[in-house]
């Protein structure tokens, strides 16, 4: 259930009447009744609430006389600002705890009362530009409000000043600065009202009104920032830091910053409009809708309509007024600086592309006169190169849309350098990688062994002699060590080539290690360990026989010509084994010899089955 204002007013009046009647019934006289009311906290709370209700009723009466019915935007702004002012008042009560009294509370309520009329006057003057009809009653109301507010602000500022001089520093400093800031607001509202009045008297639109409004806002915000700064300094010297003035001080600084930026950006936009935006011709106006969306009037060639970077056309004077507040297109809200920066970025990109092409040509010319990098190893590594022609695209080439093809990519091997020795040409090029399962790294065969040229009487077997750099001229050496763009690009390209070579070598070593299996060394029991070890039991022999087949997949060093049984295995073994048997049979025990024969028979039988 929502409590209405009428119910609150009626309840407050009834509670006040009951409180006063109770005091007179108890004390029977006027003076004792007043003392009783002033000493009772409950009675004073009821009287305070009744005073707030009376102030609210007076505000509603003056509002209806001076402003009439409020618009929705005005009521919303008034409500928001009132809540902020109430919170700031509560913070001010905490700062001035020693000066807290009934008079102090009444002064803050009166300050809030006058602030509300300042806010309403500001919003109502701003509505003048958007109102189609301005009546004589509106002018009478506004002039009355501005005169009354100016007189009240001046009176309270002078009262606070003289009170501070005669009685010393007190809470009156706060009220003096608050009314001084309100007086600056009255001055701002008066300037806007006069500018709007002058604009309404002219039959045509006044182009310079926005300029004056912008400079007036900058001037008033500067005054407010100076007042808040001076107030903070005085409060720090006299009392303490004014915490309740932080929010309005921040808002004033931000408004000053915004006004300063608006002045700069508006001047830049107007200069750009006069110098860079083209004037639309009569043929273009005839081929399009010639209605200006700002003023809703027909555009003609005499009015010099301007075309924005987004291709929308408006009156020059309409754009001048529009650019005073914002630098966007009135139709599509495109930032005019963004469009200009986009065009400039396109030109810069074209220039950069041309510079890169020139740098590549210059780098190629510089690299052509240098000796090849590692001529003996250049053919051993594959470099991903783009084949000539669109028809020569390989399966691993980039697909449409700029995405790389499926892995593995096709590798194109760079040709061998022209100054390579002849015996290096006999080495065949590395074969293509063997196909493997999809998604796996391609299997590379081991690198081919270098073939030695057996031709006699040729001098190609000697390695090439390193080139002599003493024949280079001073100009060529300076070009090689230069700090120009072309030299830096050539160095970066050489570093990239080195990285590609290193990565290719690492890749081939990984592939070689993956393809080549690791051959485990066969464990052959030594003679000394067999002599010292006691005869194994049947369980140990069985466990050893179970462990031996686990390594049967690895290649063995024992070879046989034909499968044989365990009884004939010793006779078909290698000569080394046969020759070693008679020499060790005399030193081994029969049990150890039997174990040895079983092991040899087991190994030879598995190799024969493989």
Curated annotation (Swiss-Prot):
- Which pathway does it take part in? Protein modification; protein ubiquitination
In this entry, the parts of the chain located on the Cytoplasmic side of the membrane are 63-99, 166-170, 237-610
Free-text domain note: The RING-type zinc finger is required for E3 ligase activity.
In this entry, the parts of the chain located on the Lumenal side of the membrane are 24-41, 121-144, 192-215
Q: What protein name applies here?
A: E3 ubiquitin-protein ligase hrd-1
- Please state which protein family the record places this protein in: Belongs to the HRD1 family.
Coiled coil segments of this chain: none
- Chain intervals for the UniProt region annotation (Disordered): 386-408, 452-480, 521-610
Give me the segments passing through the membrane.
Answer: 42-62, 100-120, 145-165, 171-191, 216-236
- Report whether Phosphoprotein shows up as a keyword of the record: no
Q: How does it assemble?
A: Homodimer.
Q: Does the keyword Endoplasmic reticulum apply?
A: yes
């Amino acid at each position: 259930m929502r409590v209405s204002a009428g119910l609150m007013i009626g309840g407050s009046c009834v509670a006040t009447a009951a409180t006063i009647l109770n005091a007179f019934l108890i004390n029977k006289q006027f003076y004792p009744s007043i003392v009783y009311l002033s000493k009772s906290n409950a009675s004073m709370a009821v009287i305070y609430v009744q005073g707030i209700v009376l102030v609210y009723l007076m505000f509603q009466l003056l509002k209806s006389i001076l402003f009439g019915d409020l618009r929705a935007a005005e009521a919303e702004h008034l409500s928001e600002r009132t809540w902020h002012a109430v919170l700031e008042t509560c913070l001010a009560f905490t700062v001035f705890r020693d000066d807290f009294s009934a008079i102090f509370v009444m002064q803050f309520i009166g300050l809030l009362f006058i602030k509300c009329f300042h806010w309403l006057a500001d919003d109502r003057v701003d509505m003048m530009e958007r109102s189609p009809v301005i009546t004589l009653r509106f002018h009478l109301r506004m002039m009355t409000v501005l005169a009354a507010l100016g007189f009240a602000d001046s009176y309270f500022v002078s009262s606070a000043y003289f009170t501070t001089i005669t009685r010393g520093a007190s809470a009156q400093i706060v009220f003096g600065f608050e009314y001084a800031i309100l007086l600056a607001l009255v001055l701002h509202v008066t300037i806007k009202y006069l500018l709007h009045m002058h604009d309404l008297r002219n039959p045509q639109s006044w182009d310079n009104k926005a300029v004056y409004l912008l400079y007036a806002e900058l001037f008033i915000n500067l005054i407010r920032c100076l007042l808040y700064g001076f107030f903070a300094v005085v409060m720090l010297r006299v009392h303490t830091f004014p915490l309740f003035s932080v929010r309005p001080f921040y808002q004033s600084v931000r408004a000053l910053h915004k006004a300063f930026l608006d002045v700069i950006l508006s001047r830049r936009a107007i200069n750009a409009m006069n110098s860079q935006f083209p004037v639309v011709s009569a043929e273009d106006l005839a081929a399009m809708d010639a209605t200006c969306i700002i003023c809703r009037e027909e555009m003609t060639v005499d009015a010099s309509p301007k075309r924005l970077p987004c291709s929308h056309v408006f009156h020059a004077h309409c754009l001048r007024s529009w650019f005073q507040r914002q630098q966007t297109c009135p139709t599509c809200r495109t930032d005019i600086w963004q469009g200009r920066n986009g065009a400039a970025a396109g030109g810069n990109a074209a220039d950069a592309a041309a510079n890169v092409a020139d740098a590549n040509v210059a780098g190629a010319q510089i690299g052509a006169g240098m000796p090849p990098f590692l001529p003996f190893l250049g053919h051993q590594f594959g470099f991903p190169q783009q084949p000539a022609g669109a028809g020569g695209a390989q399966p691993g080439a980039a697909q449409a849309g700029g995405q790389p093809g499926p892995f593995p990519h096709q590798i194109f091997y760079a040709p061998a350098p022209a100054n390579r020795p002849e015996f290096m040409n006999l080495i065949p090029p590395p074969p293509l990688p063997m196909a493997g399962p999809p998604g796996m790294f391609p299997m590379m065969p081991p690198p081919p062994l270098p073939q030695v040229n057996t031709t006699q009487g040729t001098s190609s077997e000697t390695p090439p002699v390193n080139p002599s750099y003493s024949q280079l001229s001073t100009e060529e050496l300076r070009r090689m060590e230069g700090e120009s763009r072309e030299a830096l690009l050539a160095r970066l390209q050489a570093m990239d080539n080195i990285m590609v070579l290193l990565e290719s070598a690492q890749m081939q070593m990984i592939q070689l290690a993956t393809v080549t299996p690791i051959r485990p060394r066969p464990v052959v029991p030594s003679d000394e360990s067999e002599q010292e070890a006691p005869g194994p039991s049947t369980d140990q022999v069985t466990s050893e026989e179970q462990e031996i087949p686990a390594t049967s997949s690895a290649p063995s060093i024992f070879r046989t010509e034909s499968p044989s049984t365990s009884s004939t295995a010793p006779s078909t073994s290698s000569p080394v084994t046969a020759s070693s048997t008679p020499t060790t049979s005399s030193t081994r025990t029969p049990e150890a010899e039997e174990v040895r024969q079983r092991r040899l028979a087991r190994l030879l039988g598995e190799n024969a089955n493989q």
